[in-house]
Amino acid sequence: MDIHHKIEGLTANAVSAAHQADLEVQARFGVRFVRYWYDEKSGKVFCLSEAPNREAVEAVHRHSHGLLADEVVEVAEGVQ
């Protein structure tokens, strides 16, 4: 999951457009963006993705819209 802490002027339309831009280039980097959450008031955005590593996630954001995450948290899925 990557976290953008403060995107100035964040709107639902803007985050949707940025997510769409990610989807258009994600395959080039072996990434699959799953979903995102945002809070317009604070400017925070959380992006859930499946990727081989953090560098691949950063590359997608860099090439699609330039809004690099402030944090990338690498996690493994638990078994139920």
Predicted segments with their positions:
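Short S/T/G/P-rich N-terminal loop/turn motif that feeds into the first structured element of a domain
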Residues: 1-28, 32-34, 39-43, 55, ...
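Conserved short beta-strand edge segments in small beta-sheet-based binding/regulatory domains
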Residues: 66-78
